[in-house]
């Protein structure tokens, strides 16, 4: 398991505006295929805890966002 910022296929962080506890980030992070335990908004990006090792996190190699 790992922690990190959730990214989309372009390598950009999932953006959020409500810092701290955030339903959107928590839902995205805890989806079955991502395997996260918890998600919240930190620095205007969705930060996830306990992600599956296979889930990509920011920064992605060769992607500038």
Curated annotation (Swiss-Prot):
GO terms for molecular function: sodium channel inhibitor activity; toxin activity. Negative results: does not modify the currents of the human voltage-gated sodium channels Nav1.1/SCN1A, Nav1.2/SCN2A, Nav1.3/SCN3A, Nav 1.4/SCN4A, Nav1.5/SCN5A, Nav1.6/SCN8A and Nav1.7/SCN9A. Disulfide bonds join 12-65, 16-41, 25-46, 29-48. Has the structural arrangement of an alpha-helix connected to antiparallel beta-sheets by disulfide bonds (CS-alpha/beta). Expressed by the venom gland. SUPFAM superfamilies: Scorpion toxin-like (SSF57095). It is found in: Secreted. It holds the Pfam family Toxin_3. Its main location: secreted. Residues 2-65 form the LCN-type CS-alpha/beta domain. It comes from Centruroides bonito (Scorpion). Keywords: Disulfide bond, Secreted, Toxin. The keyword Secreted applies. GO terms for biological process: defense response. This is Toxin Cbo5. The keyword Transport does not apply.
